[in-house]
Amino acid sequence: MSALALPGSGARQRRFGGRQAFIEKITGMGLALPATILLLLTSLMPLVVLCVMSFTDYELGAVDFEFIGLANFSKAMGDPVFRRSLWNTLLYVGIVLPGAVCLGLLVAILVYGRKRTRSFYEIVYFLPVTSTLIAMATVWQFLLHPRLGPINTFLHMIGAGEHAFLSDPALVVPTLAVIGMWQLIGFNMVLFLAGLSAIPKDLYEAAEIDGCAGGIDRFLTITWPLLGPTTMFVIITTSITAFKIFDTVAVMTQGGPMGSSEVLLYSIYLEGFQYFHTAYAAALTIVFLVFILVFSVAQSFILERRVHY
């Protein structure tokens, strides 16, 4: 015996369903409202204030200011200190990026093949990531001391002479880059280990049957192509982290000697909190953010075309 639908029951169900969906939508928006307000207050509003301030002549402590258009940006383009800090930053990134990515991949491959000692090596290589860089910078200052540091002592023992790593303009940025790589290798290793774990072992067995017996052949034909997405992520995160160098410069060199280690973030810090040129520091910050954005988008576009999923 078939059930008979009551007249108007379908319309009532549609109205009830629409009312229920509306209530759920309002409830969801209400639950998301506190997080949205927090995001606006902590992220978007400071960025808006920063953009507005970059078009003024405001200095820290001043009671009034005037809008001066693009004067701060034109000043930055002609500022030799800004150009020098930009070059030092690019040099630092140019050393850290390939070094941290390649060494992180190498360490991940070596650790991945371990059985009993894998956890031990993972902890050892990841320790620099968990350490406070400001505290470790003090340790590095001692290690690199021209007379008391063990590194120079070892170099003197093997006849390589003593080197003023932090006071030689030609060595200071590469030295800071080595410290940056030391901190990033462990983090990149963990990411590459995750990528290696996702590669099916059947592919290696099939490649071995097809005559790809050597480790280098397996790496070039299977491991490296399938690590494409992981490598793209590692390159982008490493480059952004490298561009944000500040702690080691502030603690170890303060931009010296003679500005040879002054990087973008440290220049922004000096302009804003030492010279109180707040508006000019805001303009430099905008340039810095735009530069990182363009660099990251360009990296993503180039790497995306070469990644094999």
Regions found by a protein language model. Give the residues of each.
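A structural signal for multi-pass alpha-helical bundles of membrane permease subunits
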Residues: 24-309
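Short, Lys/Arg-rich, polar N-terminal cytosolic tail immediately upstream
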Residues: 1-23
